[in-house]
């Protein structure tokens, strides 16, 4: 049965986009940027913005006051704006895009299987001259109708690379609106580590993000820019009928030996000091938690 599901999707191309179609799923890649711009199930579009690279985070107290990340690593804050499409190729049910700029080369590959599972592969190369990023990942806005979540990973509350040992691995669920806490001073929040899958669902169905390896994920009711700009919770500009979903390879730890000097940064083991990062995850229809779990099992063990 899985051999049949591996057949190539139908690829169609226009000046503006490349479309992959298989069964009830249509995935669209923007021909100008190389980014995934649409994921529709049975004609219902679930994405509200393109899936774009993210190397930054809304500054934590330690980032702002001690590590001073805006001064030391500020190039990463606007790096996505400097990435320009270098090549875009479509063949055998897959689209490969390469974007470059600012000392960064990022290759993204989207492959749609006949059962609607869209594999997203990410390969990042960083120039030696660049400082370390705070995050390696992708983010997009998804339909606000996806008002419930289920995930398999560490929880139930937020946790980070250097703050996760007390968070037990399990399956957690709730209202999407409650996924991330609200800090008095808005900042990075809501991350979950070692996530096998995250399902978001509503009355009309759902979607799952399942990793070939453990992921970091978070879901916010606002953009990262809005979170970073506000100084009080009531100042956060909230999204209208959308959730921002981060699906990340990794994020730096929060540190905190103190909060007023460079000692506030995380130890080297929890910083992103490598110059090459790669990961892969699948986006697939998932109307129930059982659907999400089955997809995750297939994805995680595909190459074993």
Where on the chain are the PLM-derived regions?
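Beta-strand/loop-rich accessory regions of lumenal/periplasmic or secreted enzymes
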Residues: 2-304
